[in-house]
């Protein structure tokens, strides 16, 4: 029984005998449930990785909450400092906050209990309306009391640790308002319709400088490709700079050289008068087309 109670076993919950207690007293090691442990028992009492992970998560969550609390107090302090920077009056003859003139000719004023400054009734807050003598506070002092109340500074006798909010940069540096990059458009090769329109327009420009409508038909005939096997009668004839009409095709024997000694203006006038028909007459019937010949369609001038 005594051996069971005062045994020198390895059980940490059993008190050792007097001999071992005296020996431990001399060695200044003492005895407790923690010191009287074997290495095996110490290893069995180590925390598992899951328990360590849970403890670390609790510590990290507490740190995040602490940072959020510091940021909340920092926003309150920033708001109070902004109000203190925006004062416009001197607090004597003017309202401390809005700068309005006080006195008989101005607005009625109240006296702040904390800062001992005068403010108008719009910038003042009545702190104790139930008392016989009302207690007025300016908005700055009222905000300061609110900061001390909501941050716990009244308990710690001072503001706790806080983090001021960061200054927001300008909106020009914001990536959502940056203009989107414009992609270069692919150039398409000109189609056949575009080239046909350009040829038609070129023919119209050439024909607009002529003196008669017969030049339109001659210029369009020159632009058309001739069929294979047919020899063109175009030749190397020079075209007039002033856009005069081309020489009519030769249907008969060649004219004598004396007929070509006239000026280009006389040729243009003769061609114009020859192309027009007398009023009241019937229009000339078109002749059948013959390969190698040109037909000039004349319209009456008005």
From Swiss-Prot:
Gene3D superfamilies tied to this protein: Zinc/RING finger domain, C3HC4 (zinc finger)
Annotated positions binding Zn(2+) 2: 112, 115, 138, 141
Organism of origin: Mus musculus (Mouse)
MF (Gene Ontology): LIM domain binding; small GTPase binding; zinc ion binding
Biased composition (Low complexity): 258-269
Listed name of the protein: Rab effector Noc2
Lineage: Eukaryota, Metazoa, Chordata, Craniata, Vertebrata
Tissue: Highly expressed in pancreatic islets. High to moderate expression in adrenal gland, pituitary gland and ovary.
Zinc finger (FYVE-type): 89-146
PROSITE patterns hit by this protein: RABBD, ZF_FYVE
């Amino acid at each position: 029984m005594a051996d069971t109670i005062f045994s020198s076993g390895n059980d940490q919950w059993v008190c050792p005998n007097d001999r071992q207690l005296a020996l431990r007293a001399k060695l200044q090691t003492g005895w407790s449930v923690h010191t009287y442990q074997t290495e095996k028992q110490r290893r069995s009492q180590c925390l598992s990785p899951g328990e360590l992970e849970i403890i670390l998560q609790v510590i990290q969550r507490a740190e995040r909450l602490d940072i959020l609390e510091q940021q909340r107090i920092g926003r309150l302090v920033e708001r109070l400092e902004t109000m203190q920077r925006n004062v416009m009056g001197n607090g004597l003859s003017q309202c401390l906050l809005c700068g309005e003139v006080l006195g008989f000719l101005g607005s009625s004023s109240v006296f702040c209990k904390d800062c001992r400054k005068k403010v108008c009734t719009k910038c003042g807050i009545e702190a104790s309306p139930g008392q016989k003598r009302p207690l007025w506070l300016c908005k700055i002092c009222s905000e300061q009391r609110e900061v001390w109340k909501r941050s716990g500074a009244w308990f710690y006798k001072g503001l706790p640790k806080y983090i001021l909010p960061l200054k927001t940069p300008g909106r020009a540096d914001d990536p959502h308002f940056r203009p989107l990059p414009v992609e270069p458009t692919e150039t398409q090769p000109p189609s056949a319709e575009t080239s046909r329109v350009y040829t038609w327009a070129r023919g119209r420009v050439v024909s607009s400088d002529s003196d008669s409508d017969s030049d339109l038909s001659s210029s369009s005939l020159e632009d058309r490709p001739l069929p294979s096997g047919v020899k063109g009668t175009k030749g190397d004839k020079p075209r007039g700079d002033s856009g005069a009409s081309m020489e009519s095709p030769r249907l008969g024997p060649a004219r004598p050289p004396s007929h070509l000694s006239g000026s280009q203006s006389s040729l243009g006038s003769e061609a114009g008068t020859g192309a027009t028909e007398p009023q009241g007459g019937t229009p000339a019937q078109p002749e059948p087309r013959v390969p190698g010949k040109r037909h000039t369609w004349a319209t009456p001038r008005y």
